[in-house]
Amino acid sequence: MRNVYDIAYELATALKESNEFKRFKAAKEKIEKDEKLKQMISDFKKKQFELEQKRLKGEEVTSSDVYSLQQLYQIISLNPDIEEYLSAEMMLAKIIADISKIIADSIEFKDELWGFADK
């Protein structure tokens, strides 16, 4: 039987070699060279985080809050480098989430993983 950690490292290597990761890395490197773009993304992510925190605390997230974030996204996405970065980041995050789901589902660990196990 193979060591699960060795397999995890193989998966990490495969992910690093994927087109999705390479696309993300190239987009990130482009953004990191421009302080204005970095700041725009940082501001957007901060607002996105604040909205998610509100939601998690059970506070009301108004349609105005959502609209404001959507407007900000539309504005910053007019820059092709930012749009490419956010798109590549979203695709990579989806792959990682899919991998986590595949693992959790295959070992029937989903409920335990998220704290919903029957006691």
Curated annotation (Swiss-Prot):
InterPro entries found in the cross-reference section: Com_YlbF, YheA/YmcA-like_dom_sf
Pfam families: Com_YlbF (PF06133)
Taxonomy, superkingdom: Bacteria
Record-stated family: Belongs to the UPF0342 family.
Protein name: UPF0342 protein Athe_0692
Organism, scientific name: Caldicellulosiruptor bescii (strain ATCC BAA-1888 / DSM 6725 / KCTC 15123 / Z-1320) (Anaerocellum thermophilum)
